[in-house]
Swiss-Prot record:
NCBIfam families linked: pyrF_sub2
Name of the coding gene: pyrF
Main enzyme class: lyase
Keyword Lyase assigned: yes
Designated name of the protein: Orotidine 5'-phosphate decarboxylase
Pfam families documented for this protein: OMPdecase
SUPFAM superfamilies named among the record's database cross-references: Ribulose-phoshate binding barrel (SSF51366)
InterPro entries for this protein: Aldolase_TIM (IPR013785), OMPdecase_type-2 (IPR011995), OMPdeCOase_dom (IPR001754), RibuloseP-bd_barrel (IPR011060)
Annotated active site: 89
GO terms for biological process, alphabetical: 'de novo' pyrimidine nucleobase biosynthetic process; 'de novo' UMP biosynthetic process
EC numbers, comma separated: 4.1.1.23
Pathway: Pyrimidine metabolism; UMP biosynthesis via de novo pathway; UMP from orotate: step 2/2
Protein family membership: Belongs to the OMP decarboxylase family. Type 2 subfamily.
Record-level Gene Ontology MF annotations: orotidine-5'-phosphate decarboxylase activity
Length: 270
């Protein structure tokens, strides 16, 4: 099944654009609980309210030699009707890029992955050639330092354009399999609106809601397409750690349901 088709089906099933980030932090998890058990309970509690899950590979790499096993088993826990996106931000050349793609899209069998465009098309091609997978290119990120490079102006097709605009245009040109999307932060509302108007058919993976300060109402208004779709709204800490102790899973379920419902409230205009 093509990524966009699966995304639409998952969104319709749960009436949701919400994507929960599975970022297990031992300092915030219940004392004595393993990352695998934490993830399992979070998935079971939140699955009715989401379109999918975003797994930040760094949190698993930080767990040492057992991290990959936890990551793999976490992917297996996620219901197959929901999407799984590996937040890996990979970007390298030649066989290295091919190996990254195999690890994430074959071995883990994730539905999508985040990639960095800094090394150019040949670094992304091994991912893009997985025609049924969603390839999300970092375009305009939610962190403060994004302006260091992404907002620089450069000459492109005879015009002065911001670098993030060049990335978006290149992504659109590379989208021959209709499997490419953009990562655009919810902290960049003016630019988010501009990108959506320019690329109404690309899915946007949108981090930055909650702890990073992104406004949910503005994100839905600016980040969805004319049908109120093609935006994957990411939330992690505000859901995973909504409550502490033994009630963490119930707290996550309630937080996910509330965010799903808030998103749908703002989608009503569509």
């Amino acid at each position: 099944m093509k990524f966009l088709e699966k995304l639409k089906q998952a969104g319709n099933r749960n009436k949701s654009l919400l994507c929960v980030g599975l970022d297990p932090d031992p300092k915030l998890m219940p004392v004595g609980m393993s990352a695998l058990e934490f993830n399992r309970e979070i998935i079971e509690a939140t699955a009715p309210f989401v379109c999918g899950y975003k797994i930040n590979l760094a949190f698993y790499e930080a767990l040492g030699k057992q991290g990959w096993e936890i990551l793999s088993e976490t992917c297996e826990f996620i219901p197959r009707e929901l999407i799984t996106i590996a937040d890996a931000k990979r970007g390298d050349i030649g066989n290295t890029s091919k190996a990254y793609a195999r690890a994430i899209l074959d071995e883990l069998d994730c539905d999508g992955v985040t990639v960095s465009p800094y090394l150019g098309y040949d670094s992304l091609e091994p991912f893009i050639e997985y025609q049924d997978k969603g390839i999300f290119i970092l375009c305009l990120t939610s962190n403060q330092g994004s302006t260091d490079f992404q907002m620089l102006k450069t000459e492109y097709l005879g015009q002065k354009r911001f670098l993030y605009e060049v990335v978006a245009d290149k992504a659109s040109l590379w989208n021959r399999y209709e499997n490419i999307g953009l990562v655009v932060g919810a902290t960049q509302q003016e630019e988010l609106k501009k990108l959506r108007l320019s690329y109404p058919k690309l899915p946007f993976l949108i981090p930055g809601i909650g702890a990073q300060g992104g406004d949910l109402k503005a994100t839905i208004e600016n980040g969805t397409n004319p049908n109120g779709e093609l935006a994957i709204i990411c939330a992690s800490r505000g859901i995973l750690y909504a409550r502490s102790g033994s009630e963490f899973a119930q707290g996550a379920a309630e937080a996910a349901e509330q965010m799903r419902d808030a998103i749908n409230h703002y989608r009503k205009r569509f």
